[in-house]
């Protein structure tokens, strides 16, 4: 065998060995990326970061991931933190939090999530672009809080969680006392893109709004004097549902173009004013009621025990509150504010802001009075 042939053989073997090592390293890297669940391919609202190295408390790698979407605005950040903390401590499931916020809140949120008490949490911070709402929302000073951009994040779930087939959305004014896996396993009927808790269920008493009648049916949210609403042939007495907590089948959501349907009714409301003038609930409710009319499944009412923020009085017994799977302080009185019912239950899950920017108003007031 000539010297030239020997060199060629050695070169071929060297190249083969190099490719073998490269292939092995590539497989290892791919496995690592899968295990750490990194993802930067979201179109629309952009992921700011993801923390893959969080310690997991005995999570089986074969478990299905449970995406939980929650909006976190700067002035309500403590609420989102308490909600996340309560979910994490009451489950052993593989939960990933998609925390939707605005750019100016991301750093504050990130520093809070780096607290020792929250280091086991797996999360992704997703920036919501308010430009998505241009031409779809009109300014209304009477709506105040519900007009903020993040209120509408729930309409864009397939964009926020692009790779998931199913997800949970919940507001920031909740505390979870049950295992979130049970809510995630809610059975949705064929063709249904979401499951909500209806306002006529037995767990939540009916709310009477001054000037609006009973705020638990469609007529409380939509203006039935408008021809476009009447043409939909929706019964005004139909029980409404609460959009603050729901389970979404994202495959079905995409198939039915739910986001596009919701945007259509948002635009029509800007042009024609289709929502009830006595609307007391969230401004996100009317378009959801239209799109999901007789086309939604239901969740266990104990997974959305609400109206805790409607008054300072305790409308539920301590025993009932303890048995609830999820407590919801919807209404004007928030558990981080001056007064609300069962603030002690909420405060159990609250973690103080390490930056000192967010304070419980009642505590701050008490300290000021002492001084």
From Swiss-Prot:
Side of membrane Lumenal, spans: 29-371
Entry's transmembrane regions: 8-28
CDD domains reported in the protein's UniProt record: GT8_like_1
Intracellular or extracellular location(s): Membrane
Cellular component annotations (GO), alphabetically ordered: Golgi apparatus; membrane
Top class in the EC scheme: transferase
InterPro entries the UniProt entry points to: Glyco_trans_8, Glycosyltrans_8_dom-fam, Nucleotide-diphossugar_trans
Family affiliation: Belongs to the glycosyltransferase 8 family.
Protein name: Glycosyltransferase 8 domain-containing protein 1
Membrane topology annotation: Single-pass type II membrane protein
Cytoplasmic side: 1-7
One Pfam family from the record: Glyco_transf_8
Gene Ontology MF annotations: UDP-glycosyltransferase activity
Main localization category: membrane
Organism: Homo sapiens (Human)
Keywords: Glycoprotein, Glycosyltransferase, Membrane, Signal-anchor, Transferase, Transmembrane, Transmembrane helix
Listed EC numbers: 2.4.1.-
Keyword Glycosyltransferase: yes
Protein encoded by which gene: GLT8D1
Sites carrying sugar chains: 249, 257
């Amino acid at each position: 065998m000539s010297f030239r042939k020997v060199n060629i053989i050695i070169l071929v073997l060297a190249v083969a060995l190099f490719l073998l090592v490269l292939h092995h390293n590539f497989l290892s890297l791919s496995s690592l990326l899968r295990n750490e669940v990194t993802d930067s391919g979201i179109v629309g609202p952009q992921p700011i970061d993801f923390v893959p190295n969080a310690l997991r408390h005995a999570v089986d790698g074969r478990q299905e991931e449970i995406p939980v979407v929650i909006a976190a605005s700067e002035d309500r950040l403590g609420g989102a933190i308490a909600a996340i903390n309560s979910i994490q401590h009451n489950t052993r499931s593989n939960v990933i939090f998609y925390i939707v916020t605005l750019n100016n809140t991301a750093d504050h949120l990130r520093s809070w999530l780096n607290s020792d008490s929250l280091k086991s949490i797996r999360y992704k911070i997703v920036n919501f672009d308010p430009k998505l709402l241009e031409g779809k929302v009109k300014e209304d000073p009477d709506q105040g809080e519900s007009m903020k951009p993040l209120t509408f994040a729930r309409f864009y779930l397939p964009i926020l969680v692009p790779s998931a087939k199913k997800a949970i959305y919940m507001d920031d004014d909740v505390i979870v006392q049950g295992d979130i896996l049970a809510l995630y396993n809610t059975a949705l009927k064929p063709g249904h893109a979401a499951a909500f808790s209806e306002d006529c269920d037995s767990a939540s008493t009916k709310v009477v709004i001054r000037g609006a009648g009973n705020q638990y049916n469609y007529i409380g949210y939509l203006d039935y004097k408008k021809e476009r609403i009447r043409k939909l042939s929706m019964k005004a007495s139909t029980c409404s549902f609460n959009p603050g907590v729901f389970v979404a089948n994202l495959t079905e959501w995409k198939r039915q173009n739910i986001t596009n349907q919701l945007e259509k009714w948002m635009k029509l409301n800007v042009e024609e004013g289709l929502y009830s003038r006595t609307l007391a609930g969230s401004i996100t409710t009317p378009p959801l009621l239209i799109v999901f009319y007789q086309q939604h499944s239901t969740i266990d009412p104990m997974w959305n025990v609400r109206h805790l923020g409607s008054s300072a009085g305790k409308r539920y017994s301590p025993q009932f509150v303890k048995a609830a799977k999820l407590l919801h302080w919807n209404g004007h009185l928030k558990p981080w504010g001056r007064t609300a019912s069962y603030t002690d239950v909420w405060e159990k899950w609250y973690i103080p802001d390490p930056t000192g920017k967010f304070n419980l108003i009642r505590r701050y007031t008490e300290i000021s009075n002492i001084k």
